Design a protein with these regions (language model features):
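A short, Lys/Arg-rich alpha-helix, primarily the initiator
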Residues: 1-22, 77-104
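Tyrosine-centered aromatic motifs in long, intrinsically disordered, low-complexity repeat arrays
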Residues: 24, 118-122, 145
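Short amphipathic recognition helices of helix-turn-helix/homeodomain-type DNA-binding modules
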Residues: 68-86, 154-159
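Short alpha-helical "recognition helix" segments of helix-turn-helix
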Residues: 20-29, 105-114
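Short amphipathic alpha-helical segments
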Residues: 30, 115, 148-159
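DNA major-groove recognition helix of helix-turn-helix/homeodomain DNA-binding modules
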Residues: 52-72, 135-154
Length: 159
């Protein structure tokens, strides 16, 4: 078993939200998107929520573990793996990135890792006949996917 870094849930979620979509996490948990918001901010809201409990924390850790493991198997490629257990479904690189963007906050990759802007990324997704990702971009995207997966596997959220 790996050694995990314990991080309080109210610190971990904003950090993780930079990399992955919390909407995907709440969908995996079968909760509404506002569930996390109400749990995090219950002291400042008129809500019946009492914040996170042990069951919530356990569920979040399980989801982060599943997402992390699946991201480690996910790779963007001109020759897709066709493995059902990845996030990169689709024949073309833009299709694979679109399916991956349901889980990952793509600005984390194209701004933070590639140093590009939204227009650069959007052009390559919307008009792949004209604009392409080069091999270096694909390699850096795949490294970022691995990094996110490893980070998710290395943390344990706590109360």
């Amino acid at each position: 078993m790996r050694e995990k870094i314990e991080i309080p849930v109210n610190e971990a979620l904003p950090m993780l939200a930079e990399m992955i979509k919390l909407k995907y996490v709440t969908d995996e948990l079968g909760r509404s998107y506002s569930w996390i918001y109400h749990k995090m901010h219950y002291k400042h809201l008129k809500t019946t929520s009492k914040g996170f409990n042990e069951s919530d924390i356990s569920s979040l850790n399980e989801v982060f573990e599943r997402i992390g493991e699946k991201l480690l198997r996910t790779q963007i490629s001109e020759f897709p793996n066709w493995d059902d257990d990845t996030y990169s479904e689709g024949e073309t690189i833009p299709e694979q990135l679109k399916s991956l963007s349901e889980v990952i906050n793509m600005p984390y990759i194209y701004i933070g890792k590639l140093g590009k802007d939204k227009d650069w990324f959007s052009c390559r997704i919307s008009t792949p006949q004209r604009y392409r990702f080069n091999e270096e971009h694909i390699m850096l995207i795949n490294l970022a996917i691995l990094e996110i997966g490893k980070k998710l596997l290395s943390i344990k959220v706590t109360l």
